Amino acid sequence: MKKIYFMILMLVLISTNQAFGHKLISHDDSHRNFESALVIPDHKISWAIYDNLGVNEAKFYTFEAKKGDSFYASIVIPKIQGLENYAPTLVMVGEDNFFRDKVIYENGFPGKEFYEPFGQVTYWERQELRTEIPKDGTYFIVVTDEKNQSGKYSLAVGEIEDFSGENMFTLLPKAWLDTKFFVNDYVSIVIAFGIFLAMCSVPVIAIFKKRKTKL
């Protein structure tokens, strides 16, 4: 029985690792200016940041880069009722404002859909930013509202999938849970918690029955 549980767990970890390409960056929602910008450890690695904006708000992210580096960032919107026309602005700014690249979404709404199998979530695609870093330095990504809208978005940075050194037994469950909270899918959380309790109860019941038969 233990071997079966282990094999099932390994298959789940392998399949979810293949489906989930981004490493999540958690935060406390305090990155609201350049001084408190959320640090992106390595802009080449594929990261995802779940975030939200109020009307006329902005969120700030920062990273270090070298001249000639390729940089990628994009925004997607979770397919939630009320966000069909939501499209915040994406701005890349160099330290001391020596470099600035502003990208707005200019296609139709609600936008092209894509399904993310790990979190079982559908997103609407928005704008992408691809550029070459002009010189060594500190850079900022600013996601801001310019349309008097509020909503949720996922900011993706980098394109290299790298989970080396990560504990997948803790990383994947946390990432799944964060995704469900992000899209307000509390039903899936309750179901998963119920399944977890049921699985934990199986060995307990087996031990209880074994002791009972001995008596």
Please identify what each model-predicted range represents.
Residues 1-4:
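Positively charged n-region of N-terminal signal peptides that target proteins for export
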Residues 7-15:
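Bacterial N-terminal signal peptides
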Residues 22-33, 61, 82, 87-99, ...:
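C-terminal edge strands of extracellular/lumenal beta-sandwich accessory domains
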Residues 29-36, 50-51, 97-115:
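A surface-exposed loop-and-adjacent beta-strand signature within N-terminal beta-sandwich domains
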Residues 40-66, 70, 75-79, 89:
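Non-catalytic, beta-strand-enriched accessory regions in extracellular/secretory proteins
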Residues 105-132:
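Extended, solvent-exposed segments with strong compositional bias
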